[in-house]
Amino acid sequence: VVLEDTVTGEKRDLAIEGLFVAIGSDPRVGLVENQVEISDERFIKVDGRTSKTSLPGVFAAGDVIDPTYRQAITAAGSGCVAALDAEHYLSSK
């Protein structure tokens, strides 16, 4: 990979075996925009450490709720939380 210093323009080679490319960090909340509460930063608001949104029976997880870490592993963990919250919600009905 060729790295370029954006200040000096200097280029240098870096030998690597793999590369992760970040393709964006804007949460995509359009699907639920007018149905659940959205923060000013455009993230879906959830109730504390749960995945419960402002609309009963709708749960959110991953990058659309996480303005801090934005990592695949934390998104996967919040997906598990959402699945468990949804299971609990459905079993109580």
Question: Where are the predicted features?
Answer:
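Conserved beta-strand-loop-beta-strand element in the redox core of flavoprotein oxidoreductases
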Residues: 1-13
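Short glycine-/small-residue-rich Rossmann-like dinucleotide-binding loops
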Residues: 5-7, 20, 24-25
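Short, Lys/Arg-enriched charge-dense amphipathic segments
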Residues: 7-9, 36, 71
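Non-catalytic, surface-exposed connector residues within folded enzymatic/regulatory domains
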Residues: 13-14, 73
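FAD-site-proximal beta/loop scaffold in flavoenzymes
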Residues: 15, 22-69, 78, 88
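Internal hydrophobic alpha-helix adjacent to the cofactor/substrate pocket in enzyme cavities
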Residues: 73-93
